[in-house]
Amino acid sequence: MRGPKAPKDPTKKRPSIYLMLDKNIAGIPDNYGNCRDTNFMEGRLLQQIKGICDEIDDDILKLLEHMDGFTKLVHSIGVSITAQKDEEKDSFITFTMQCYGKADKYGSGTQVTAKCPCNGEEVMIPVDEMNINENDDIIGAFHFDFPENCQGACVTLRFYLNDGYSVPEIEVDPPIDYESNAYDEMIERSLLNLGNVKRLKKAIEKAKRGEKVVVAYIGGSITQGAGAKPIHEMSYAYLSYRGFCERFTDNDGANVTFVKAGVGGTPSELGMVRYDKDVTNFGEIKPDVVIVEFAVNDEGDETEGVSYESLVRKIAKADNEPAIILNFAVFMNEWNLESRLVPVGENYNLPMVSVKQAVVPQFGKNTVITKRQFFYDIFHPSNDGHRVMADCLIHLFEEADAAEMPEEDSDFTRQPAIGADFEDVVLLDRANFEEFATISTRGFEGSDKEIQYVERDLNNFPSPEFENHWAKTENVTDAEFVMTLTCKNIVLVSKDSGSPQFGKADVYVDDKLALTADPLVNGWNHCNPQIILNERESKEHTVKIVMHPGEEEKLFTILGFGVTL
């Protein structure tokens, strides 16, 4: 191959801001059969940039808060994608920058797309060739659409700046030495409390004997596997499960079942409601070990820890006495809710692992893994971060195996540390309501096809959460849902949405307004639990749900209820 006789001088590179740097992406099928990797940027964009380069001036970053500032600052977008497998490097992935609109958040924004080769070649998208207009508000998301023949890739995405703007060059991170003493010391710091390991040792001994063992995980998006690529093979849950199998079985874990029940953006308030369905399948599955991870999801928990402790006690009360491990993840800003949740673990002397205690001290000095390496975005760990989280749990497994067998089990009947109002909560939905309640559903006979989907267990494809729901039928203006039952507390689980088709609903308990549920407050499609009744004694109550005045034609989806009878 011969080159040009007179090659042009290289074009001088403009200063650039990195949005993604050598980040793993993967094409996971959605419920429509498309393979897409989505990175949401609303409320995260500036922190994500700071996570890659903390020295960028705040005045420059503020220009990226809205699209008018973006067009002023940014000259072009550069996207380079490299397939992980050589045979996939002839493929193309379609990149999309989705702008959220001012009027219709998801429907009116501009979408900037480019077809990118998977051979590492950088594709440039000039801003002056984009159709960005006054209706565009913010950068909402980056999407990567995969062809069938390409499953995993690595992407670098950056904004090249217009003349007159400059930002610092970033330094390349050194590789992570997973075999170093410093790495081992970091992992050892994660063991917040070995605790009473009687139940955990019993599960380990069962596994060693070749008996059937179930290792289950319940939590938020990190447990679901967010940031892990591919999600079903690189999540901390799967990696630590594999670590359990490799250490305590001689058949590669053939006798150990993996249950993964992480749901993005949801707290323990929802976890306690869905535990029976998502983890135990209403008693058909009996977990021997349950890892609970809500330390970065419970900020919005209206019970401030009562739901979390209720979930712990609910799990512990099972006839087969499962071991419970409390797992505390951390955000890029070094925050979690350990200070609230650790007292629950201390109350029952539970094994506890703190990823925060492991990684945060070394971010500043004696660094083993940088923030840029550990985090996929401001909330979720990367593949490296998931590996660290898994190694923290595996270290606990090993320490428990080496420890003496305690004579006594933990006492889960003792006075709660925070509260346990919901420890006997059960799920009530369209599939089982006749066991508990009398319900009339005028106008709520529909089925919502756009509910939250999550990847469960060993699957790399999503399946619906709360599929047995009640959805308001379109064009019905007098919809009324009425439920009568005997209970002492009720948690309403409804669907949040970003669609303007959805409207507020008024929720009455015994003819008193308990709350007005607004599905647009959080602005995205997920499950939202809200307490509408919490009393000490069980008695008959009637729940009525109607659309808020002025919004009778809009949609609303009741996903289910958590009730204590």
Task: Name these PLM-found stretches.
Residues 195-204, 238-244, 268-283, 305-314, ...:
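Alpha-helical scaffolding within the catalytic cores
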Residues 238-256:
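Signal peptide-proximal N-terminal region
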Residues 293-297, 307-343:
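Active-site segments of SGNH/GDSL-like serine hydrolases
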Residues 78, 99-101, 120-127, 323-328, ...:
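Extracellular serine-dependent O-acyl
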Residues 214-218, 223, 257-262, 288-293, ...:
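Structural recognition of the beta-strand scaffold that forms the well-ordered cores
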Residues 221-224, 263-268, 295-301, 322, ...:
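Solvent-exposed loop/turn segments at secondary-structure junctions
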Residues 1-217, 223-230, 249-254, 387, ...:
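N-terminal secretory targeting modules
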Residues 216, 224, 228, 268-305:
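Oxyanion-hole/transition-state-stabilizing segment in secreted/luminal serine hydrolases
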